[in-house]
A protein has these predicted regions:
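Short glycine-rich anion-binding loops that position phosphate/pyrophosphate groups of nucleotides
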Residues: 11-13, 88-92, 172-173
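Class I SAM-dependent methyltransferase SAM-binding "motif I" and its flanking Rossmann-like core
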Residues: 2-5, 101-158
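Ordered, amphipathic secondary-structure segments that act as subunit-interaction surfaces
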Residues: 79-97
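A contiguous loop/helix-start segment that scaffolds small-molecule binding in enzyme catalytic cores
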Residues: 2-6, 81-82, 161-233
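Conserved helicase motor
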Residues: 61-68, 141-145
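Short Gly/Thr/Asp-enriched flexible loops that form oxyanion-binding sites at enzyme active sites
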Residues: 93-108, 182
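Short active-site oxyanion
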Residues: 28-34, 110-113, 165-166
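Glycine-rich, flexible N-terminal cofactor/catalytic loop recognition
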Residues: 1-63
Length: 233
């Protein structure tokens, strides 16, 4: 029976080829079909897998917000061909639309094989020193003012009442705005950790209380950087 392999990709730019352990690479060298977010980025990742098939003969299928007829992406599985599922960055299905494909695979009794790799969300949580036994990934922070204030109230309650760590990401060009908003609207004793450009040479983990962030806010420029925002006590 065909299998769906969930293949991790590099967190770095330019792409790093030291992501998947060698013994796992051997499991996927035979693949000829891949589902990716973006064809160009997916092709760069696939080249590093050192497949048995040359890249020109690899079938690359895109899954993104413009994709129609998602069921059709699984057709190779039904004819006995294994498929690899890749995110543009990090782990498939984590802050990534790949979960739709995995859900369909389960519905069709296709074996799903997750491979080991790095997640910026978990790396950031590990490095934050905040509660790793009760945490929530919230995706992107709301943009509209009303929804933002509702979210602030919600996460503040969860942080204080349940000691639940809250994790967010943001579009890189809105990072600075989100940082300022959090500092100006959260309670002084809440801890905010920024995990910046993880696994890159300029990686930073910065942790302060909101009170302290207010004193040093102008010191850090995170515009257009890859940042994980982590909140807790």
């Amino acid at each position: 029976m065909a299998k769906l392999y969930l293949i991790p990709t590099s967190l770095t730019n330019p792409i790093d080829d030291c992501v998947i352990p060698q013994h796992q690479l051997l499991l996927i060298k035979h693949l000829k079909y891949f589902i990716v977010e973006t064809a160009k980025i997916g092709r760069m990742h696939i080249k590093l897998l050192k497949l048995d098939t040359i890249i020109q003969n690899v079938n690359i299928l895109e899954l993104n917000k413009h994709s129609n007829n998602i069921d059709k992406l699984l057709e190779p599985l039904f004819t006995g061909n294994d498929i690899g599922l890749l995110s543009d960055c990090g782990l498939p299905c984590i802050a990534d639309p790949g979960n739709i494909i995995v859900s369909l695979a389960h519905e069709n009794k296709i074996e799903v094989v997750p491979l080991f790799g790095s997640s910026s969300l978990l790396l950031g949580l590990m490095a934050s020193g905040l509660n790793g036994q009760n945490f929530s990934f919230n995706g992107y922070f709301p943009i509209s003012e009303d929804k933002r204030q509702d979210k602030i109230n919600q996460i503040t309650n969860l942080i204080i009442k349940d000691k639940q760590t809250q994790i967010f990401i943001e579009t890189p060009f809105r990072n600075q705005q989100l940082l300022k908003y959090l500092v100006h609207n959260l309670k002084d004793d809440i801890i905010l950790v920024l995990a910046i450009n993880l696994m890159q040479k300029d990686q930073q983990i910065i942790r302060h209380s909101i009170n302290n962030w207010g004193k040093i806010l102008d010191k850090y420029v995170i515009h257009k950087k890859e940042v994980v925002f982590i909140l807790g006590i």
